[in-house]
């Protein structure tokens, strides 16, 4: 099969490719480059019969003496089951990196090493978990290692990696793959979590709301400032969150919980 590697792919074409791909991350969309403005970027891909089959949004950072770092957040965007295409894509990517003075290509692919229920981790509940994302993980990691990538290991420190190792998600399907009804989904939550849903806390003065207005970022920042002072840490700025709201106008949502102190007490 004949393949063609291209750089400088039109952002609209690449965005369509990413959005139509079965499993990928928002960090591979062109919108993410609007947030990471301190980095240069490019969209590259491998075509088969004029169809894009492998792709990557590359973030480029200038280092010393004209050298660069290539970082592909939550990429590549590919199914990993076409060994020939993956091999050619990586080979051409390395050539492109070398030509542009990159001394390292860092990737953190959107693949999952393991899946479990938080109740199993906390209390060893023995809850059966439907495996969705970990079916071929070992094979994919081995393929990438064979192509020259070095696995970063499994460190537990929060700042050990560019992106967090752990992702919390609520499964909307049962172990057989069927979507939960609303009340069924609610029953999957721990009891103390269920208490926060519905009238139980509303009657006690706790109210939940959401907003897509970036002017409300100031309310988020006021809470983050309290967290920074309490934990002695530094979190993201108001400017950063407003960038997110601008870059993802149809997807970025702010969620708030507010307490009526007089009623709650």
Task: Please report, for each region that a protein language model flagged, where it lies by residue.
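A conserved beta-strand-loop-helix scaffold within acyl/acetyltransferase catalytic domains
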Residues: 3-49, 53-66, 111-114, 132-137, ...
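Acyl-donor binding region in acyl/amide transferases
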Residues: 66-160
């Amino acid at each position: 099969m004949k393949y063609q590697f291209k750089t400088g792919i039109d952002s609209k074409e690449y965005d369509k490719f990413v959005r139509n791909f079965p499993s990928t991350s928002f960090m591979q969309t062109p919108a993410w480059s609007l947030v990471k403005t301190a980095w240069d970027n490019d969209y590259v891909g491998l075509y088969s019969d004029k169809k894009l089959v492998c792709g990557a949004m590359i973030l480029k950072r200038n280092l010393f003496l004209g050298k660069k770092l290539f970082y592909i957040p939550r990429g590549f965007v590919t199914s990993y089951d076409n060994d020939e295409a993956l091999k050619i894509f990586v080979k051409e990517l390395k050539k492109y990196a070398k030509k542009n003075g990159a001394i390292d290509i860092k990737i953190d692919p959107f693949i999952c090493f393991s899946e479990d229920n938080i109740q199993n981790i906390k209390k060893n509940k023995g809850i059966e978990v439907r495996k969705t994302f970990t079916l071929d993980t070992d094979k994919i990691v081995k393929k990438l290692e064979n192509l020259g990538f070095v696995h970063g290991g499994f460190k537990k420190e929060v700042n050990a990696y560019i992106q967090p190792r752990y992702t919390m998600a609520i499964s909307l399907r049962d172990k057989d793959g069927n979507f939960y009804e609303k009340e069924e989904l609610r029953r999957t939550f721990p009891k103390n979590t269920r208490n926060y849903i519905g009238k139980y806390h509303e009657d006690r003065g706790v109210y939940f709301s959401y907003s897509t207005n970036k002017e409300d970022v100031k309310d988020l920042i006021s809470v983050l400032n309290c967290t920074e002072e309490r934990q002695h840490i530094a979190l993201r700025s108001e400017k950063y969150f407003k960038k997110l709201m601008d870059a993802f106008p149809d997807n970025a949502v702010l969620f708030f919980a507010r307490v009526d102190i007089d009623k709650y007490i």
